[in-house]
């Protein structure tokens, strides 16, 4: 229970007790006053009745005496009255009604005296009755004030809790409580402090005193211990939780310096764990077990809370933060404190793990601990004070390295207090663990590009081909393989490529996007500004690829004006702008680039055009001289006239070659034999030749026809006209634009012979173009008759013949297969093919 809850409970109990006491005191006082008033009233009434009774008796005697005298007589002389003896008052019933006294007599004086006394008693009674009312009013006011104070306190606590939740470190508020009960570790540190100071002379780290090292959290630690006891009951305890709890008395810096021999277990076992390992613990004792450092512990957390705490990295970090009270930064001091406090951790650090494992018995293996967060950056100062809940939040250090999991099943004799058997040795690994490879000289080998494969386990009882491989039979060329498949070279190359792709732009004149394009093209040129300047002056020295990139770098008119008007430092410009500014200083610079590119590509263009012209001429000659193609046309003509008998299409003397592509669309009654199949069968029967011979013969006779079908005559004619137009611009550049300046004489002298030679070649190409067009028109008229303007393409006839030859080869193959299978009439057996 928190301190605020205790305060509220105590205040409520105090109010209840005070109200009860006040109530009983008021009630008792009022009852006593009432009883006293009743007693006084009864006594007064009795006295009045007695007095009234005595007077009545005297009057009655006097009346009786006067009557016995027998008449009216003068009153006797007064005589001294004898002394009346004090008679006891008559015994009358308290409810007896006495006669009224005679008015004007002694009774009146007596009533007057009684009235004064009654008035005094009534005023006293009213004063006594008003006293409890005042006390009740005071108690009510006190209760109201206490209630208002309680409401104010509750509202203040609620606001404070809301503020804590809203703070960034609110999630750690539950773990930042500080207990005033110091643990045993404080006395340990105080005991070893003189030895540490004597060994190190007070230098290095600073050991904190007991008030600073007091256990910061008693309640979370009790919860951890109780959770550990509960886990041992249901078989869900683990070495990780035990080790994390025992190591909570030390800082993370000490945990980080634990030697490997301790297997990651903290050397600070609790007294409870030692007693558990020495004697068996009954379930009743487990339920009564508590931490020796905290005598009063809260409730034991449930299994769900323990599982969430065990599997949550944030909870483990917060628990470690809450119990870590100081950080000793000096390495030597930490090791000295560690060795003096827990000498058994150096030799048998793993013994506590074995004891916990022996106690766990036949417990189920716990789930693996979550991976620890990355370690924090190194601290700058040598001493860090642990902040409580009143101070600012401190970033929690990461948890220690989790210990290895316990064995799956422990022997039963260990749970009954028997000797602890050593664990069985681990099985040999399937593959050797990875280790950094080293070369012959001991230097580590560079990492290469991996080859992904599946390893094969060696079978000891089976002979394999891999057993015959000798390790010394093959040696690698390390330099070659590193140069080809090394990561460093490739990464450096990629880094250079990335830098080249995204260059840093300095001072520039042109637009940024346009300048980036110029920079990319400049990389394709791969030449300096001086080399390009010299090549443009002389007319040679650059390849076709470089000239094409330079042509693409030609700036617009406004861009050229900006670069020409720039009169600043040329070296301050980016490389692309500097190159353009140097090039623009040459007269007709980009016209020269076009002329040089024309000269470089002229020979290739002319060769392609001449080859196409020659192929067209050969194709025309093949179509006019092919005899087998003529026989095929004859067979198709006769078959078509037979099928068109009685129609307007019958009796034809010729047909356009487009009809050859329709022969495969006319199918027979069997649904598979086409008209082309019939024509091929008739040709093989009449000529006593194989169908394959027909297809092969036509393919050999019409070889160039198939090639010509891929030629576009319009492209050829456009190429010839383009060459002629380019030569005209070069003549204009050399003859007029560059003829007046002496600096241009080198370029003019170099281009003049080429201009003369190119003129002659272009004239030959123009003559060849006219000749080829004449042949194409002639072959088209040879097959189709008069060709009008409706002819879409002069070379369409070559495309038709190429497609028909492909269909013919397929049909001839089918006919030959049907004939080989059945040996009879292939037309009758074509359905079985």
Curated annotation (Swiss-Prot):
Pfam families: FH2. It comes from the Eukaryota. InterPro entries: FH2_Formin, FH2_Formin_sf, Formin-like_plant. Residues 77-91, 364-379, 393-409, 420-431 have a biased composition (Pro residues). Residues 438-833 form the FH2 domain. GO terms for cellular component: cytoskeleton; membrane. Residues 26-130, 199-234, 254-326, 340-435 are annotated as: Disordered. SUPFAM superfamilies: Formin homology 2 domain (FH2 domain). One of its GO terms (molecular function) is actin filament binding. Residues 108-122 have a biased composition (Basic residues). Residues 1-19 form the signal peptide. It is found in: Membrane. It is a single-pass membrane protein. Keywords: Membrane, Signal, Transmembrane, Transmembrane helix. Residues 260-271, 310-326 have a biased composition (Low complexity). The chain crosses the membrane at residues 136-156. Disulfide bonds: none annotated. GO terms for biological process: actin cytoskeleton organization; actin nucleation. Belongs to the formin-like family. Class-I subfamily. This is Formin-like protein 2. It comes from Oryza sativa subsp. japonica. The gene is FH2.
